[in-house]
Amino acid sequence: MAINPSLLFLSLLFLFNGCLARQTFSSQQSQNECQINRLRASAPQTRIRSEAGTTEWWNPNCQQLRCAGVSVMRQTIEPNGLVLPSFTNAPQLLYIVQGRGIQGIVMPGCAETFQDSQQWQHQSRGRFQDQHQKVRRFRQGDIIALPQGVVHWSYNDGNERVVTINLLDTGNSANQLDNIPRRFHLAGNPEEEQRQLRRLAQQMQGRSERGEESEEEEGEGEEEEEEDNPSRRSRHQEEEEQGRESSSCNNLLCAFDRNFLAQAFNVDHDIIRKIQRVRGNRGTIIRVRDRLQVVTPPRMEEEEREERQQEQRYRHTRGGSQDNGLEETFCSMRIKENLADPERADIFNPQAGRISTLNRFNLPILQRLELSAERGVLYNRAGLIPQWNVNAHKILYMLRGCARVQVVNHNGDAVFDDNVEQGQLLTVPQNFAFMKQAGNEGAEWISFFTNSEATNTPMAGSVSFMRALPEEVVAASYQVSREDARRIKFNNKNTFFFTPSQSERRADA
């Protein structure tokens, strides 16, 4: 039977319209979910204890993080603690809040350029030489850029705790899974962390709290039934042993068949059995029995070299020459920069504070990650001029002190007007106007942006939108005199700050 072309066209058109309508509805539903009418400063919701540290997660299901497409965690590493190798499904920025240590990042396809010199000397006597990819030192104030799917580990070789704040950009185009944060562990027993993240994932998928509890109870019942079933216990000894070991081991290597792994690594089955055996609930941060001995550059030598390189970079940038990133190969690209040094500040006011920015121009890898950051300091009662982020969401973490923050949406409603305390997190959506003023003890913060070249538009000051408007437009828009319009435009000579003396004079007037 011949098919009528008109009928076929109408059928295809109907199907296309149906698909388009479904996509449009889904898009509208997603947009409606992100009609933010209220923001909150929040602390971590979950806390997972490991042998030598803790991992804390903010709830990625909360509206402000979900709509920004990010997840945030905080890690505390005790002295001599080792964060076991893992990778994530999304690029991340890691800020060192306190402490110092070493970190290794495994770039796929890159050579092992670090070699043990002592073993090199004894190689002629038959001793094997160890070699591995580059190990970097980190210290307080460093920001480290980690691409998605790249293995990383870290070790606290200092005498104080290391604290990091990690932003995972789950909404990034590089993440082709979903917006649930996923850490793929290659060692250790991340069972508790996985359980907590599964619970948060269930919330993100719209399951009720009662449904989560019933599913957990069912899961526990199945485990008990499996243990009590005699037919299961009668299995062959090796399978039974492997099953018992894997039940307390949740990293990627545990689930693979032992024979396959033995062939893949070209080692004996006993070695694979040791790899897959996890004794005790040590978690994902373990305590090393003896000091970890790996090849690293001397601490002061590397830090001094980094400072010299940064100084040369800034000198060239200020002279009009900007790094284009082409001279950096994938294997040798810089992934770290320190923002804590006051001399590193890009914006500075001796009465108000300073801001240091990090973007794709001074750390080219950020162009790949589509992220950027800033570290800010406000002195006693000083403030940041009202402004908005043109092209990015802003995720602010208070490092020290506190600040009053106001955020205003497109309806002119204040969706946040409160203090952000030390250790709290606040998301400022794209285009929402905001301002902040430090408390009596000042304030320090780190902000992450979901764009590699985040741009702000100040509402007052020397580079503001108000300064760029004609005087007549200001007078007509706000129904003020020409003299008042002139004062609004030109009275604040600062670029991004206002000082406490200015605000006090306005209040007294």
Curated annotation (Swiss-Prot):
Organism, as annotated: Gossypium hirsutum (Upland cotton)
UniProt KW keywords: Disulfide bond, Seed storage protein, Signal, Storage protein
GO MF annotation: an example: nutrient reservoir activity
Biased composition (Acidic residues): 212-228
UniProt biased composition (Basic and acidic residues): 299-314
Domain annotation Cupin type-1: ranges: 39-273, 337-486
Lineage, opening ranks: Eukaryota, Viridiplantae, Streptophyta, Embryophyta, Tracheophyta
CDD domains membership: cupin_11S_legumin_C (cd02243), cupin_11S_legumin_N (cd02242)
GO biological process annotation, one example: seed maturation
Protein name: Legumin A
Disulfide bonds: 34-67, 110-331
Residue segments, region Disordered: 187-248, 298-325
Protein family according to the UniProt entry: Belongs to the 11S seed storage protein (globulins) family.
Gene name tied to this protein: LEGA
